[in-house]
């Protein structure tokens, strides 16, 4: 298990950070065991045509075991478990939302950019977020109201902070496997834009570190894809907004997220600016 100094989080949520870190690191070690093999185990396609491997399922089992041992009364909603009806989920005021292997396609292609995502959700919002990238040996954590941090090489927690955007040099994140036509149009219309390719929840973390500015996702994502990363980015000073300008919320009737923009500079009305780009071709038109 990784060694780390105590982080600057306070009760009562600090106990949940400990639980999430232990679970993420144990699941990450399990994933690395599969990753080092020639094959990641049997691969099958889910109903939405996304791949799932033995590694996904074993990571799920590890997370559920560790989290239930630590907090047996907390419900767990996982990508790799049965779909729980909203009528059953609606009364949950606090629960774990987990993605045991975010970036399965990258995992299979050996990009190193797969993660374990764990969020503690309260009343529709993520209040604890952990994103662990085992192949990169990187761990990110955030607590609502207490900031976002990356675990440094020396075991110390490094506070994360987003940066103000340079409109002449916008660094736009694009998924390696999901860059849709709307994102392509955005890249074409932004003069001087730089593209940064990254898989999964690490896109939120790059913006939180100030290494990228903008991530626009028009394709489908699920709540477990975004909750932990959203918590990290927002606590680093960034924003995550829907096309209507609303914050992403959780434990909805349908677990599919709407299109959204994640950005580091909160001083900009990103949804209006992006709309202006498509309508006028002018970044400063909004």
Regions found by a protein language model. Give the residues of each.
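N-terminal subdomain of lithium-sensitive/metallo-dependent phosphomonoesterases centered on the IMPase/IPPase/PAP
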Residues: 1-101, 185-188, 279-286
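Oxyanion/phosphate-interacting regions
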Residues: 1-22, 185-189, 205-286
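Residue-level signal for inorganic ion chemistry
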Residues: 31, 56, 67, 104, ...
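Short loop/edge segments at beta-strand edges and connector loops
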Residues: 78-80, 199, 244
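Glycine-rich active-site/cofactor-binding loop and its immediate structural neighborhood
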Residues: 92-136
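Acidic beta-strand-loop-alpha-helix segment within the catalytic core
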Residues: 118-205, 254-286
């Amino acid at each position: 298990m990784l060694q780390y100094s105590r982080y600057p989080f306070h009760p009562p949520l600090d106990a949940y950070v400990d639980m999430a870190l232990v679970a993420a690191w144990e699941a990450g070690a399990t994933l690395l065991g599969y990753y080092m093999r020639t094959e990641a185990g049997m691969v099958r396609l889910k109903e939405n045509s996304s791949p799932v491997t033995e590694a996904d399922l074993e990571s799920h089992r590890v997370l559920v075991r560790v989290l239930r041992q630590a907090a047996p009364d907390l419900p767990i909603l996982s990508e790799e478990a049965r779909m729980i009806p909203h009528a059953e989920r609606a009364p949950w005021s606090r629960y774990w939302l987990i993605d045991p292997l975010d970036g399965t396609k990258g995992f299979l292609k050996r990009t190193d950019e797969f993660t374990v995502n764990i969020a503690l959700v309260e009343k529709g919002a993520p209040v604890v977020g952990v994103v662990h990238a085992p192949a990169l040996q990187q761990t990110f954590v955030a607590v609502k109201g207490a900031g976002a941090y990356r675990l440094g090489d020396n075991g110390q927690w490094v506070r994360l902070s987003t940066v103000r955007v340079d409109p002449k040099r916008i660094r736009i994140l694009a998924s390696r496997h999901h860059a849709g036509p709307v994102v392509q149009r955005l890249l074409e219309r932004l003069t001087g834009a730089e593209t940064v390719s990254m898989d999964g929840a690490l896109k939120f973390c790059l913006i939180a570190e100030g290494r990228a500015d903008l991530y626009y996702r028009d394709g489908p994502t699920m709540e477990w894809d975004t909750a932990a990363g959203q918590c990290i980015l927002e606590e680093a000073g960034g924003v995550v907004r829907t096309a209507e300008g609303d914050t992403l919320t959780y434990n909805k009737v349908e677990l599919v997220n709407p299109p959204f923009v994640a950005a580091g500079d909160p001083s900009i009305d990103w949804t209006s600016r992006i709309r202006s780009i498509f309508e006028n071709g002018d970044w400063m038109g909004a």
